Curated annotation (Swiss-Prot):
Subcellular location field: Cytoplasm
Reactions mediated catalytically: L-fucose = L-fuculose
Listed cofactors: Mn(2+)
Subunit organization: Homohexamer.
GO cellular component: cytoplasm
A Pfam match: Fucose_iso_N1
CDD domains given in the database record: L-fucose_isomerase
Protein name, UniProt field: L-fucose isomerase
Active-site residues per Swiss-Prot or TrEMBL entry: 337, 361
Listed pathway(s): Carbohydrate degradation; L-fucose degradation; L-lactaldehyde and glycerone phosphate from L-fucose: step 1/3
Molecular function via GO: arabinose isomerase activity; L-fucose isomerase activity; manganese ion binding
Function according to Swiss-Prot or TrEMBL: Converts the aldose L-fucose into the corresponding ketose L-fuculose.
HAMAP family found in the cross-reference section: Fucose_iso (MF_01254)
Length: 591
């Protein structure tokens, strides 16, 4: 099969078309602006898979309809998924704009006095607004000289934020969500909404019964040599935690080995179902070798699978991590309990940062008073106003232990192309594999248990669907918190201590849902959330606006909120603008 190419960024230099001196005097400056933009983006950005970002520049500057059409023809042939129009001068507004209705687009109008780049920017944005095709405005804060080829810091920030979000939009389009199973324990997020995926994300849903996973395992539709490699890797790297089951439910060595074997097979088969595997064609399984073109997946598990077979905890944890028996590699996006809406939040976070994601229950709010009563410990520092216990048996990537290190030696989660094998090994060494609790998982399994290091910046997100409104996005920036070991042990043993934990302290604003930590917990829209490394809420906001998903809750500084220019015409309060604009324009891929 022909490999699907990655989306590219189109750069559109537009120019005043008047010959006999005007256009000629601007050609070099305008094209250099396009080249500088392309150089910035290719230097600073990568696709989530680690591949370099490519920019495609129009063959000529664009002065009118003919050159705009020629540019569009070139872009259409090269899989351009988003565009940035650049100019230092006046040009002819609606004659030169990008008219593709679903392609994210921005315009950078140079802030200079010699030629009115800002005037074109305003005229072009007015045309976009009038035609119902929103575009992002980029305009430097300070005036630059005409011969200044540098890109100011504020312009660079907007170019990169737009491009990150636009690449996420383009990368999701045309892919699928693999729904492996159905609704898990009545969890609304696992009632997979095909219209949401199709209309807002441009994706399809591939619904597959869990018996397909059973069939692949039982009929050996996998690479048997790879299974042996996976088992050897687990034997070398897995540390096992205590078995907290009653004696009658504890498994002997042979039974435990069978559970481990099937857990690793589940990871292999789910991966093959998502992306395909040419090795399957070699054993005569050509249809299965193709996969389902899935950029994200979810596994129902509970209870129709887990009452009889090993749970998905090991498979999900390994797939979501940036490494396995094949070494360091791109993480997959697999939502536990087939919570497709949390899966979408994971997908967004992964596309924006290139990193693995932490799937968790938003389990418990611990007030400072409650912790002091139970443990005698008085919270301070980042945790002084209370903390939220994020914990779940399944999809937390092992990267979430934060045993990787940034350039300053601080704990973090890095994109896979920056992770060393030593850092991957450190994450494995920080993880224990605990036998699943029989009362919950009768078929057995192993849950990963680790504790996220403290002081790490995170952004917690969640997508919810509201009847009559559609999808909404929640965002809470904050930090992981490290508690004294004895305090952690006391709190952790009050719940399921065989699962991975992140203690999370959201950044408070003193207003609305961020009045206090309790309010964050009380306003969270579902039982699950996702942690993405870094304070990247602004990127999520920009991405959501491209997809026309309003943000119902966030604690991002107002100066960092970046949405299409037309949002400003939808009222004076920026969050109300977001709702009205998203309702006005409707989902990006209207159906």
């Amino acid at each position: 099969m022909k490999k699907i190419s990655l989306p590219k960024i189109g750069i559109r230099p537009v120019i005043d078309g008047r010959r006999m001196g005007v256009r000629e005097s601007l050609e070099e400056q305008t094209m250099n602006m396009a080249k500088a933009t392309a150089a910035l983006l290719t230097e600073k950005l990568r696709h989530a898979c680690g591949a370099a970002v490519e920019c495609v520049i129009s063959d000529t500057c664009i002065a009118g309809m003919a050159e705009a059409a020629a540019c569009e023809e070139k872009f259409s042939s090269q899989n351009v998924g988003l565009t940035i129009t650049v100019t230092p001068c006046w040009c002819y507004g609606s004659e030169t704009i990008d008219m593709d209705p679903t392609r994210p687009k921005a315009i950078w109008g140079f802030n200079g006095t010699e030629r009115p780049g800002a005037v074109y920017l305003a005229a072009a944005l007015a045309a976009h607004s009038q035609k119902g095709i929103p575009a992002f405005s980029i305009y430097g804060h300070d005036v630059q000289d005409a011969d200044d080829t540098s890109i100011p810091a504020d312009v660079e920030e907007k170019l990169l934020r737009f491009a990150r979000a636009g690449l996420a939009v383009a990368s999701m389009k045309g892919k699928s969500y693999l729904s492996l199973g159905g609704v898990s324990m009545g969890i609304a997020g696992s009632i997979v909404d095909h219209n949401f995926f199709e209309s807002w994300l441009g994706m399809k849903v591939q619904a597959v019964d869990m018996t397909e996973l059973r069939r692949r395992i039982d009929q050996k539709i996998y690479d048997e040599a790879e299974l042996e490699m996976a088992l050897a890797w687990a034997d070398k790297n897995f540390r096992y935690g205590e078995d907290e089951n009653n004696k009658q439910y504890q498994r002997n060595a042979e039974q435990s080995r069978a559970v481990l074997r099937e857990s690793l097979l589940m990871a292999m088969c789910i991966r093959d179902m998502m992306q395909g595997n040419s090795k399957l064609a070699d054993i005569g399984r050509v249809e299965e070798s193709l996969g389902y073109n899935a950029i994200a997946a979810g596994f129902q598990g509970q209870r129709h699978w887990t009452d009889q077979y090993p749970n998905g905890d090991t498979a999900e944890a390994i797939l979501n991590s940036s490494f396995d028996w094949n070494g360091v590699r791109k993480p997959f996006v697999v939502a536990t309990e087939n919570d497709s809406l949390n899966g979408v939040a994971m997908l967004m976070g992964h596309q924006l940062t290139g990193t693995a994601q932490i799937f968790a229950d938003v389990r418990t709010y611990w007030s400072p008073e409650a912790i002091e009563r139970v443990t005698g410990h008085k919270l301070d520092g980042l945790a002084e106003h209370g903390i939220i216990h994020l914990i779940n048996s399944g999809s937390a990537a092992l990267d979430g232990s934060c045993k990787q290190r940034d350039s300053e030696g601080k704990p973090t989660m890095k994109p896979h192309w920056e992770i060393s094998q030593q850092e991957a090994d450190a994450c494995l060494a920080a993880t224990e594999w605990c036998p699943a609790i029989h009362e919950y998982f009768r078929g057995g399994g192993y849950s990963s248990r680790f504790l996220t290091e403290g002081g790490v910046p995170f952004t917690m997100t969640r997508v919810n669907i509201i009847k009559g409104l559609g999808p909404v996005l929640q965002i809470a920036e904050g930090w992981s918190v490290e508690l004294p070991k004895d305090v952690h042990d006391i709190l952790n043993k009050r719940t399921n201590s065989t699962w991975p934990t992140t203690w999370f302290a959201p950044r408070l604003t003193g207003k609305g849902p961020f009045t206090d930590v309790y309010s964050v917990m009380a306003n969270w829209g579902a039982n699950h959330g996702v942690l993405t490394i870094g304070h990247v809420g602004a990127d999520f906001i920009t991405l959501a606006s491209m997809l026309r998903i309003p943000v119902c809750m966030h604690n991002v500084e107002e100066t960092k909120v970046y949405r299409p220019s037309a949002w400003a015409a939808h009222g004076m309060d920026i969050e109300g603008q977001d709702y009205r604009a998203c309702q006005n324009y409707g989902p990006l891929y209207k159906r």
